């Protein structure tokens, strides 16, 4: 995939996967993004984004075990890669640098 940067929604999804650790799968990521962003998101949008992030090398996935609760279906569990962590740290640094140049937010303003 050509574009290796992060869009805003991709960043939220990647952060949610980090927060969830070994419990990151479609629905749990959706709920985590909604909880922290305060907005409603579609499960389909989350799935597309998870796979796009995997294509970019920022996530890896494996199939979890099947459970009776899920009708003996398995769920795909996602994990952030080292490249994904680097990308998140880079995004955080850019945002912090830019925030410091907003006059209304400087100390004493």
Pin down the residues of each PLM region.
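N-terminal helix-turn-helix DNA-binding core of bacterial DNA-binding proteins
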Residues: 3-45
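Beta-hairpin "wing" of winged helix-turn-helix
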Residues: 56-71
């Amino acid at each position: 995939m050509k574009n290796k940067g992060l869009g805003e929604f991709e960043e939220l999804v990647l952060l949610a996967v980090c927060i969830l650790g070994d419990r990151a799968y479609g629905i749990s990521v959706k709920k985590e993004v909604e909880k922290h962003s305060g907005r409603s998101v579609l499960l389909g949008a989350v799935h597309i984004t998870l796979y796009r992030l995997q294509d970019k090398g920022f996530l890896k996935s494996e199939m979890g075990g099947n459970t009776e609760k899920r009708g003996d279906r398995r769920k795909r569990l996602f994990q952030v890669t080292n490249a994904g962590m680097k990308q998140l740290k880079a995004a955080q640094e850019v945002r912090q640098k830019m925030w410091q140049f907003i006059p209304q937010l400087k100390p004493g303003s």
